[in-house]
Curated annotation (Swiss-Prot):
Belongs to the plant self-incompatibility (S1) protein family. The lineage of its organism: Eukaryota, Viridiplantae, Streptophyta, Embryophyta, Tracheophyta. Residues 1-20 form the signal peptide. It is found in: Secreted. GO terms for cellular component: extracellular region. One of its GO terms (biological process) is rejection of self pollen. This is S-protein homolog 7. The keyword Translocase does not apply. It comes from the Eukaryota. InterPro entries: Self-incomp_S1. The keyword rRNA-binding does not apply. Keywords: Secreted, Self-incompatibility, Signal.
Length: 135
């Protein structure tokens, strides 16, 4: 019985760690620049309560992505700001790109955020591309 308890504790701690594995794959967020004009650069800035991932520029047809794990406390939330255009403040949207379920730790979740001329679209395991935000 003690061995089973130790095994359960190790699995729970592994689930909350920052080290990904095949048993507990990391979640992934992708940001794709699908604007029609080559010169239209997408700027992505994501952060959580614990980390600021910095500002990244994404050229047309390219992707920026990162991996992360859910917290065992159910508090993983990643907020991102996407902007583009000559005046970056004109076309700017801030939104929650990922929010952990309070009762389920997810492993290997993939969310693809695609910036298009008319707005920001989400593709994930639940549905194909759906427009979530307008510019």
């Amino acid at each position: 019985m003690n061995n089973l308890f130790v095994l359960v504790i190790i699995i729970v701690l592994s689930a909350g760690s920052n080290n990904g594995s095949k048993l507990f794959p990391k979640n992934q967020l992708y940001f794709r620049n699908s604007f029609n004009r080559n010169y239209d650069i997408l700027t992505v800035h994501c952060k959580s309560d614990k980390d600021d991932l910095g500002i990244h520029t994404v050229a047309r047809s390219y992707v920026y992505f990162f991996k992360f794990g859910d917290s065992i406390f159910g508090d993983t939330e990643i907020v991102c700001t996407l902007n583009h255009g000559v005046s970056a403040t004109k076309y700017k949207v801030t939104f929650t790109a990922y929010k952990e379920s309070r009762f389920v730790i997810r492993f290997g979740a993939i969310k693809i955020w695609e910036a298009r001329d008319d707005g920001i679209y989400l593709t994930d395991e639940d549905h194909d591309a759906v427009k979530m935000y307008g510019w």
